[in-house]
A protein has these predicted regions:
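Non-catalytic substrate/cofactor recognition surfaces at enzyme active-site rims
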Residues: 1-141
């Protein structure tokens, strides 16, 4: 969609929210079967807060994530938003960084982004997918 021509429909609505995300222990992989212990991860990288920043202006919904989200998710999220009459803008690097979030079926793939940057283990792909779908479904238009 050409977002430069998106118009606000009806009365302008402005909403903001922050959703804290609960993650498991960090599991930074060094090799297929070797991971840094959570205490070592924290001593090297510190505590890593995780959250979504949400802003809605009229029918435009902005969701910003602490995790770098794989583009594989975007098509389904955009379709869901369009069903609700919303224009979705998803961004990452919102002030914290929790690594790369991929669909769970790609967790063991041999891609360097998935291996080295997937810091909190399997299960986060489905978790983030559900979270963002919930945000879209709860947005008003």
């Amino acid at each position: 969609a050409d977002t430069s021509k998106v118009a606000l429909q009806g009365e302008s609505l402005l909403r903001t929210s922050k959703v804290d995300i609960q993650l498991g222990e960090p599991q930074l992989r060094v090799t297929t079967n070797l991971r840094l212990r959570p205490w070592l991860f924290r001593s090297l990288l510190g505590e890593v807060p995780a959250y979504l920043d949400i802003t809605q202006v009229g029918n435009i919904l902005f969701i910003s994530s602490s995790g770098e989200l794989s583009g594989v998710f975007y098509q389904a999220w955009d379709a869901l938003a369009q069903e609700k009459g919303l224009h979705l803008v998803v961004t990452v690097f919102n002030g914290s960084y929790i690594g790369y979030i991929t669909p769970d079926e790609l967790y063991d793939a041999k891609y360097h982004e998935v291996r080295e940057m997937n810091w909190f283990g399997p299960g986060n792909g489905d978790y983030f997918d559900r979270l963002i779908q919930e945000v879209i479904l709860k947005a008003e238009n």
